[in-house]
Amino acid sequence: MQRIALYPGSFDPVTNGHLDVVRQAVHLCDKLIVAVGVHHGKKPLFSTEERLAMAHEVFGPVASAAGCAFDASTYDNLTVTAAQQAGAILMIRGLRDGTDLDYEMQLAGMNQTMAPSIQTVFVPASVPVRPITASLVRQIAAMGGEISHFVPPSVVAPLKAKFA
């Protein structure tokens, strides 16, 4: 049986924190699916297509180097439903701090009630990337700050261009 893991998020933009989670997650599964959430009530900075392209460009080579199959797709339903539809048995969630843990434990409990066969796996963020959030990265970029410490190199120019 192939161990498929789903790593959901908005990825707006892809950050070094996301990359850190993927670097760990590819060793936990045979196939990793990055699921880009489409929330019709939100206006993301990057289009769905741009976020998918970033995911493929940044995460694909990491998965390949680890011998893990990779795909990126979108979803606009419950995350647990997207995981079921993908055939996932694991849902990957990154944790930066205790606040993340409290929130993620609540979600994991709800998801386990709805889909008992899908296990949530918490991946602790490495120390250097713990403070990184996509919303802070967007704010720094909007104010002309240096973002290269927070996002992969291939994301720097597209992110700067959004505020040029």
Curated annotation (Swiss-Prot):
Pathway entry: Cofactor biosynthesis; coenzyme A biosynthesis; CoA from (R)-pantothenate: step 4/5
Question: One GO term of the cellular component aspect?
Answer: cytoplasm
The residues that hold ATP are: S10, F11, H18, G94, L95, R96, E104, V129, R130, P131, I132, T133, A134, S135
According to UniProt, residues marked as the site described as Transition state stabilizer are H18
Q: Name one Pfam family in it.
A: CTP_transf_like
Q: Where does substrate bind?
A: S10, K42, T79, R93
Q: Gene3D superfamilies given for it? A: HUPs
Biological-process GO terms, alphabetical: coenzyme A biosynthetic process
EC class name: transferase
Q: What is its EC number?
A: 2.7.7.3
State the InterPro entries in the record. Cyt_trans-like, PPAT, Rossmann-like_a/b/a_fold
Q: Where in the cell is it found?
A: Cytoplasm
Reactions catalysed according to its record: (R)-4'-phosphopantetheine + ATP + H(+) = 3'-dephospho-CoA + diphosphate
Q: Does the keyword Nucleotidyltransferase apply?
A: yes
For this chain, one GO molecular function annotation is:
pantetheine-phosphate adenylyltransferase activity
Which UniProt keywords are given for this protein, alphabetically ordered? ATP-binding, Coenzyme A biosynthesis, Cytoplasm, Magnesium, Nucleotide-binding, Nucleotidyltransferase, Transferase
UniProt-listed CDD domains: PPAT
Listed under subunit, the entry gives: Homohexamer.
The job of this chain, per UniProt, is described as:
Reversibly transfers an adenylyl group from ATP to 4'-phosphopantetheine, yielding dephospho-CoA (dPCoA) and pyrophosphate.
Would you tell me the protein name for this molecule?
Phosphopantetheine adenylyltransferase
Q: Which organism is it from?
A: Bradyrhizobium sp. (strain ORS 278)
